């Protein structure tokens, strides 16, 4: 039987937002339920994000988490969560100027 990854093992490389792939950074504003989140993205828009099944079972998401989001490209402002960043990864994103610190503080202050 295969063993799962331990809690402290490396998760691999941290994915970055890419204009070619269409991904962007977002912050979870509200957990709607049934595998959906309301996220505020760096472009200032609020989207409805779906958590894929493989993530839903393994990764818990809560308000204030920073996620990598892939919009579906339709007019109804929906998309899919690709990755959830850990606290140290969020600090790296802020240091690389990919994520405005004001956006993180704004959502954290609203809780």
Curated annotation (Swiss-Prot):
Its job: Seems to be required for maximal rate of protein biosynthesis. Enhances ribosome dissociation into subunits and stabilizes the binding of the initiator Met-tRNA(I) to 40 S ribosomal subunits.
Q: Which InterPro entries match?
A: NA-bd_OB-fold, RNA-binding_domain_S1_IF1, TIF_eIF-1A, TIF_eIF-1A_CS
* The name this protein goes by in its record: Translation initiation factor 1A
Which intervals hold domain S1-like? 12-86
Query: Which organism's genome codes for this protein?
Result: Aeropyrum pernix (strain ATCC 700893 / DSM 11879 / JCM 9820 / NBRC 100138 / K1)
SUPFAM superfamilies in the record: Nucleic acid-binding proteins
Where on the tree of life does the source sit, at the highest rank?
Archaea
Q: Which family does it belong to?
A: Belongs to the eIF-1A family.
The molecular function terms in GO held by this entry are:
RNA binding; translation initiation factor activity
């Amino acid at each position: 039987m295969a063993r799962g990854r331990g809690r402290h093992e490396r998760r691999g490389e941290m994915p970055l937002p890419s204009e070619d792939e269409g991904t962007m950074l977002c912050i979870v504003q509200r957990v709607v339920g049934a595998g959906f989140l309301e996220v505020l993205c760096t472009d200032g828009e609020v989207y409805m994000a779906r958590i894929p099944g493989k993530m839903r079972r393994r990764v818990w998401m809560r308000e204030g988490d920073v996620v990598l989001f892939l919009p579906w490209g339709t007019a109804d402002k929906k998309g899919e969560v690709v990755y959830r960043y850990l606290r140290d990864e969020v600090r790296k994103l802020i240091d690389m100027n990919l994520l405005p610190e004001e956006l993180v503080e704004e959502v954290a202050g609203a809780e």
